[in-house]
Amino acid sequence: HSEKTPRAGAFSGYLNKEKETEEAWKNGWFHTGDTVTMDETGMLYFVDRAKNIIRRAGENIAAAEVENCLFEIEFVSKIACIAVKDDIREEEVMACVVLEDGKKESKEVAEILFNHALEKMAYFKAPGYILFMDDLPVTGTQKVVKHKIFEPEIDPRNLTGVFNFTHLKKRKPND
């Protein structure tokens, strides 16, 4: 490989995004930003984008895993799980939820979501905060654009209507 074609077969950079290109290419290798696991046979499995991994008290939580769990509930229309600041545990999971038409936002509905996650996943993965929203920003292909949900200067934990479940996140005997 020459300097002009590092690791042939990969692309040379992002269009008009010099900083992002520089961050992605390190030591001649392209870093995709994906997080994967490998099983004992060498098979790779996609977990999530690294930027969507929530770091809580030393645990890595894939936002996609929490989203998939909460999507099992029939009245969830759209969902995005994001990291919010936590003074003790570094980050905490916040679920931003759009309900199906006709389903009303309430503490009881938030409790259903939280308890479902708590039952299906390790306690630390359950959303510590739940916020119901009218809609979520999406791309033309309907993928949620997480960085556009809140303005950077906003702390979503302090918004009106946020349900705080952090005090209920306790280790279960099997965790």
Locations of regions flagged by a protein language model:
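Acidic/polar alpha-helix N-cap and adjacent early helical turns
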Residues: 151-175
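AMP-binding/adenylate-forming catalytic core of the ANL superfamily
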Residues: 2-8, 12-13, 20-23, 35-125, ...
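A general structural signal for short secondary-structure boundary/capping elements
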Residues: 143-144, 175
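A structured beta-alpha segment of the ubiquitous adenosine-cofactor-binding alpha/beta core
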Residues: 28
